[in-house]
Every structure is written in C-alpha cells, then in structure tokens.
Amino acid sequence: SEMKSLINIGKDVYDEKITQFEPGSVSTFKYSNENYIEHVEDITFSSPNSFSTLNNNIKNIVLENIYKKLYQAVEKRVDNTERPIACLLSGGLDSSLIAALVKQIHKGELHTWSIGFEGSEDLKYAQLVADHIGSIHHSIQVTEEEFLFSIPDVINAIESYDTTTVRASVGNWFISKKIKELSNAKVIFNGDGADEVMGGYLYFHEAPDSIAFDKDCRKLLTDIHYFDVLRSDRSISSHGLEARTPFLDREFVQYYLSISYKLRDHRYNKSAEKYLIREAIEKHNP
C-alpha cells in the first residue's frame, strides 16, 4: 500500500485520525449500526520488545548459534525463490557477509552490484570481496549531478522527506534501477538491519551501560519500518525487484536479542562494533 493513494481523498476524511498500520500485527474491524467500520482490536504477533533476554553467556556456543541462525536465514531465502538472484555489495562487513553466504548456498552464478562516485573506497573494497567470493561483479559509477537529479524520484518512491532517509536511499534506488535495466535479476539480497540488531552505529560506543545498549537496539528495531526498511524495501521494489534482508529474519533477531546484554555490548567487551558476528564468521571463513 502507498500513501500516495490518499492524495485525492475528501477533506472530511482528513478530519479523522489516519495512522500507519503497524508491521507484524493484525487488526479486526466490524460494521456498526451507523453503517461505518468500527475498530475492534489490534493483535501484535512480533515485536523486538517481546523477545526475552536470557543468560546466554557461554561464548563459544553463542558464536556457533549466531552463525547457524544467520546461515539458515540466508538459506531459506535462497531456497524459497526460483527467480534470478543478485546481491548488493558495498564492501562493508554486513553486505559482504550476506553475499558470501549467498554464494555458498546458491547453485549457479551470483552477480553482485555496487555503486559509488569515481574513486570511491566502497567500489574498491566491493571488488576485493567479489574477487574473494567468486561473484560476477558490476560497479556502477554515479556523478553528483545524477545523484541530485534522482532525489525527486527517490522521495516519490519512499514517500518520505526525512533528510537522512532520503540521502541513504539514493544509492539503493539508483543501483536497483541499473540492476533492472542491465540484468534479469529479480531477488536482491542486502545487508540491511545488522546495525540495528547488533548495535553497530558509532553512537553505541557512548552507551552508558549494557542495559541502555540493549534498549536502544530494541527501539531502533521497533521503528525500523520508518527508516532503514522503508529505504531498502521501497527503493528496491519501486523498480519491480524483491528485497531480501536476512539480518532481520525473525529467528535470527530473536536469538541475537536473547544473548545477555553485556556479551552483546562491544563497548563493555572492549571490542569493535558487531564483534560477535565478526568472531562467529571468522571461525567459518566464508
């Protein structure tokens, strides 16, 4: 559904409270005697705040389970489609990991795609990763003029004027446009969601304690449909492609949030951000 469909509705409807339907939920309505629809109840089936944190402190077991859950998240998405697959690859940890796992699981050639300005470090590192995993790689260079010219189309696609979201969406929108034009790929894997699940943003280093670290991860995940998922899903789907985001797999997220606060908190463990996934993958060297 798109908000653009509300543009031509009557003014009397605007006087009513219009809210966004929450993801992972079901609402029940019924006709009342006055011949209008009455809201009965909402049921939420999945929310990050409902996932319990357990005392999972045995690190070796945790690392093995992290890898297993992520591998299964990728595998189910690869196996459940017969359409041509491609991966977005920035050269960073998250997209590189997903691309490597897809390459392991996928039977056949895998095309990876990256985008950046001329001389971009992202393009260089994406090519290094592609060479390592053996994918057929496509680097798309974009100019500042093309970047700026696409902004109105991006805003129309994602239905948001949020400055950060729009800026972050341009690359996804542009590379999806190129994938549509230059290939037959229909299902696009990406590394989105990892920073929210694992506290990967730089400001997480400033968390006062591990409880605050956990609380902010859950808040970001609760609101992710307003920002990163909106950016990723709509930028890609606006070109007739289907996004696949394994880091937001329900079972993976539920398990990761069950790990004790302190073990997940890289600041507390004097480690790099997302250190658990780094160590989990290092053991398997995809």
State each model region's role:
Residues 178-181:
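Short, well-structured alpha-helical segments in soluble
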Residues 162-166:
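Acceptor-substrate binding/catalytic loop of class I
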Residues 112, 150, 172, 197-201:
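Adenylate-forming
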Residues 185-215, 222-286:
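Mid-to-C-terminal catalytic subdomains of enzymes
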Residues 59-66, 98, 122, 167-172, ...:
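Hydrophobic (often cysteine-bearing) scaffold residues that line and stabilize catalytic clefts
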Residues 1-160, 186, 282:
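Cysteine-centered catalytic environments shared across enzyme families
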Residues 69, 220-221:
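Basic, alpha-helical interaction scaffolds
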